[in-house]
């Protein structure tokens, strides 16, 4: 990464972290993927039960492999029914996620189809750890919503066998298709419980 962009990301991340702290959430800056994994593991005690909500960013930095290789109870939802997976996630010690977008003052936006991810962010798991690439930082809530709807959601639709206009056109049509992956919008602007939500900002382009 260009050194000037790296410096810009570090400065911007500090502003985001200040915003998160003002919202009863914790923020961290990781200069690269390896530092992000190290920071995440410091937040996850050994022996913890860990669930995840389709977080490609956690895979990209190597965190999932580190958890599978370590002394953790990683809940593999691929081996469970949807209902079993959801109940296990609600009861997990740690829930891993990313954000579709985050504002420069620490507000996160997430869109979900089945809503398992946004429901676990809102309540249930004892701790939520976000892995967020600096490419997802937006100037304000309006920009964050636009990114979530017109960048993250159309890209996410490519992963599934769905028939939505965003999948074929690459932008949001505010559709009401039976296949829509945008059933729930979650704006996380404050955490009721201190030390529950932790956001690791990674100096990289991650996720969708």
Where are these regions (language model features)?
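Short, flexible active-site loop motifs that bind/organize anionic cofactors or intermediates
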Residues: 3, 25-27, 134
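N-terminal active-site beta-alpha-beta segment that forms phosphate/nucleotide-binding
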Residues: 9-96
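Conserved phosphate- and dinucleotide-binding cores of soluble alpha/beta proteins
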Residues: 90-208
